[in-house]
Amino acid sequence: MSDKWDQRFIDLAFHLSGWSKDPSTKVGCVVVGEDREIRSTGFNGFPRGISDDNERLTDRAKKYPLICHAEENAIMHAARIGVSLKGNTAFVTWPPCSRCARSLIQAGIREVVYPTPQELSLIHI
């Protein structure tokens, strides 16, 4: 991490990842403007209104078609409340998949920050 603020936002993303009910993968995302103001947040989970019962969460054939990644949820939340993410930075607990990287670019995110493998090895969740 480059400074104490980067670490704070990564720590917050890890906190948000704990909100995910997915038993196997927990990812959090915090999108921050140039003024260090939080613009949006997200964690991986099912869309609003979709039951997140244990059967769906543990059956990959049922889970994967429905699950929204943390980055997607942060982008969709910002769109829902009318907040532009253009020029912002996304802090994510894990390197984005190619689909999320594409979505972050399309949303105008200028930078993505995530822990290095060495930093991840020091984190105990």
What are these regions (language model features)?
Residues 1-123:
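Zinc-dependent deaminase catalytic domain
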